[in-house]
């Protein structure tokens, strides 16, 4: 891991997300070799984790978000995260650059959702980093009145000083950073400078090994960290941590009419089946726990210079 990290940091010859892929693959290989889930190898703290429903952006009007949140509540979810109105790039799955946020409209959505689901559902907002500092403070104060749990990643993350000022100005916890590179080292600096109240961690930034380190740092400082996104690797990390440190599994993105429960054709099952109480049942198979559909994969191989490998 340290060797790969030096390639990322000094040589720039290995992209950080590719380092994460390699690290996760090595953990998967280790787990399959000893016939244990990675989460058990790392300590095995739990077999299920509370889930929150994470919405797609731009679902519709505030009433559409409210109805979707109610549907999720009826399905068993105890928490719901709003991704509201964003100038969205559908090809990159990220906000289009240099486009404004819509803080007033976002708050209308947040208010409609709270009124619909009542006081017994945990709610969060993620504006995808499109607000200014002034907008973030204003939205945060509205969310405090609506009893939202956290405000996630409201501004771009290249200016940690803006985040420090934001955390000073608000009582609602700020969850960040989400996308800034640097993995464990960047996030340690954010804790040191009090730029966020809760840490966002992700296997894409250094893999499972880096997430282990980030969890340990949060434990040392008495802070919570939350996994960004779902997936097999994040499932294993959550299985190795307690609810006191990493509370939720992010399940989504979800929208009305979207089939989340059917696995893609190259997999035998999804990684995050939901029970009736709104918990994700974590994988129990060896390694990362995924089972590949080799019949589908072999039937859909792409020929390369006349040679293909069948498993």
PLM segments and residue spans:
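Metal- or metallocofactor-binding catalytic centers and their adjacent structured scaffolds
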Residues: 1-33
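Short amphipathic alpha-helices and their capping/turn segments at secondary-structure boundaries
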Residues: 25, 30, 66-74, 289
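Shared catalytic-loop signature of beta/alpha-barrel
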Residues: 141, 147, 158-279, 283-286
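A generic structural signal for well-ordered alpha-helical segments
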Residues: 30-31, 72, 117, 167, ...
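Conserved, mostly hydrophobic/aromatic
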Residues: 22, 35, 80, 126, ...
């Amino acid at each position: 891991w340290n060797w790969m990290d030096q390639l990322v940091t000094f040589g720039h010859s290995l992209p950080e997300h590719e380092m994460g892929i390699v690290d996760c693959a090595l953990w998967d290989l280790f787990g399959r070799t000893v016939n244990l889930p990675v989460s058990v190898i790392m300590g095995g703290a739990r077999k299920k984790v509370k889930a929150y429903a994470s919405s797609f952006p731009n679902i519709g009007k505030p009433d559409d978000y409210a109805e979707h949140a109610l549907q999720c509540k009826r399905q068993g979810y105890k928490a719901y995260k709003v991704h509201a109105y964003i100038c969205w790039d559908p090809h990159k799955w990220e906000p289009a650059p240099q486009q404004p946020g819509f803080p007033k409209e976002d708050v209308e959505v947040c208010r409609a959702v709270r009124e619909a689901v009542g006081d017994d559902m945990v709610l969060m907002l993620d504006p995808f980093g499109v607000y200014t500092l002034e907008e973030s403070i204003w939205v945060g104060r509205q969310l405090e009145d609506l009893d939202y749990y956290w405000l996630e990643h409201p501004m771009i993350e290249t200016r940690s000083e803006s985040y420090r000022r934001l955390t000073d100005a608000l009582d609602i916890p700020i969850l960040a950073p989400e996308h800034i590179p640097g993995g464990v080292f960047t996030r340690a600096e954010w804790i040191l400078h009090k730029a966020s109240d809760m840490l966002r961690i992700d296997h894409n930034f250094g893999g499972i090994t880096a997430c282990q380190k980030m969890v340990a740092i949060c434990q040392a400082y008495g802070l919570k960290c939350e996994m960004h996104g779902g997936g097999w690797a994040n499932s294993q990390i959550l299985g190795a941590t307690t609810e006191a440190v990493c509370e939720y599994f992010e399940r989504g993105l979800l929208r009305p009419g979207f089939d989340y429960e059917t696995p893609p054709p190259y997999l035998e099952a999804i990684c995050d089946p939901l029970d009736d109480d709104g918990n994700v049942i974590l994988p129990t198979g060896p390694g990362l726990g995924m089972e590949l559909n080799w019949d589908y994969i072999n039937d859909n191989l792409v020929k390369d210079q006349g040679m293909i490998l069948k498993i």
